[in-house]
Amino acid sequence: MAKVLEENDLRLVADVLVIGGGPAGTWAALTAATKGSKVVLVDKGYCGTSGATAPSGTGVWYVKPEEKLREEARASRYLLGGKLAEIPWMNRVLDQTYENMNKLGSLGYPFPKDDIGDPYKRGLQGPEYMKLMRKLVQKAGVKILDHSPVLELLADENGVGGATGVRTQSGETWTVRAGAVVIATGGCAFLSKALGTNVLTGDGYLLAAEAGADFSGMEFSNAYAICPTFSSVTKTAYYRYASFYYEDGSIVEGAGSQRGRSIIARNLLQGRQVYASLDQAPEEIRPLLRVNQTNFFLPFDRLGIDPFKDKFPVTLRLEGTVRGTGGIRIVDEQCSTIVPGLYAAGDAATRELICGGFTGGGSHNAAWAMSSGSFAGEGAAKFAKDLGDKADNRTLKSVSTTTFTKSGSGQILSKTGEAIQAVQEEVTPYDRNLFRTQKGLEGSITRLDGLWNDLRERVTTLDIAGVRHREAAAMTATARLMYNTARERTETRGMHKREDFPEIDAAQGYRLISGGLDKVWTQKAEVNKEAVTP
């Protein structure tokens, strides 16, 4: 792998460039490297510690290859997802997840033992998992650039061929030329302060849109997670053991973690605080819950609260597309986009294929991350290999919508902060994003269009100010895709809720494809018709 320093710039050449160092990105890099590709992985943070998985424990959609178990797994969230998942994709992801989880065990992941002494592989501890993935990626010969966010993709008439960015700790810029690029930048939580999501600002969506990629299921993007008002840990699965109370101790009827979050939201909208207690958790599993998600309990311990006995105030924290299902549309089994040389994996890609319009938690997302990462890494490696010597003669240019300069950071950061706040004011309130209406969506779209136009006209810098500007632009672009597709889906399906169309409409059992930057477009697409028996 060539490395040349020119004018304080880092320049690298690779077969495959992976953008993002979470589970999807590391699996993509590892897979491409094992196929013989020279791989560079760039991470906005530190690969192995940044992102939503690294600080958390997560369930995994790990199911043994027994038909009855697989049938139950396919049906588990099919109805919740609005019947938009597809059997072939569910089967592929179940197979790949089974293979990858077993591989992790053989490579040193310390799976706990179940009651009969077998490794328990339906969950992963984020810190151990991502520490191992970084180690495996490095051992495979992948070059990792930490603290190196991407600012622009590079492309020519034949497709994407690299990217440029900045190393935020040193201030130097970097360029990677590559035969193929995998976007594994995660979803967008709009800087809501949910644990691990500070780097998840929709950057990959903006990069993909600028390159000409399209999106699917962006209406399924309004995930809100239950969490204590004093914590950033959004471990929604634990609230299956919760009872919800008003301040006077009476029960909040219908409130729950899977189907009852709307009831919590409506009370919070009315200024009525809701409290929770994990008092339904059986005594014998409480120690196990603590072991599985230690950081969930730390805020309680600091405040002297026993969450299994005491009542504590809760809120709903926006997780957007991180726990949503919409994302970059993929067009084949290798997770290719419609742009040659560009692949998408993990939360950056649509997850409708395996769970429709509702994930319900980490297990499907974790399975999708490792599986789609593997698929994309293999596809990108093959694309780069087929490109061969042609890669050396490409005249690549930036496809960014942003103009960069070398001075003016202070003023830029100030204006960027205002833009980020403006986006958050459109996507965070429950009565705009969770409970959607035609009038509300159109008002938000008008304001977001104006914000996008304003950001398009601004000049920014090749430094941290430029990174923040691109985050603001990415969040704005993401919100516009979300709300334009939400306006077109005039029904309630999956996590998408329309107050003015509260029922599911059988005639709308299709996907909504979207794209565009200055003008967002939407169109309908059929779902694979093979039905799942719930």
Name the predicted role of every residue range:
Residues F383-A465:
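Long, amphipathic alpha-helical stalk/connector segments used for oligomerization, subunit docking
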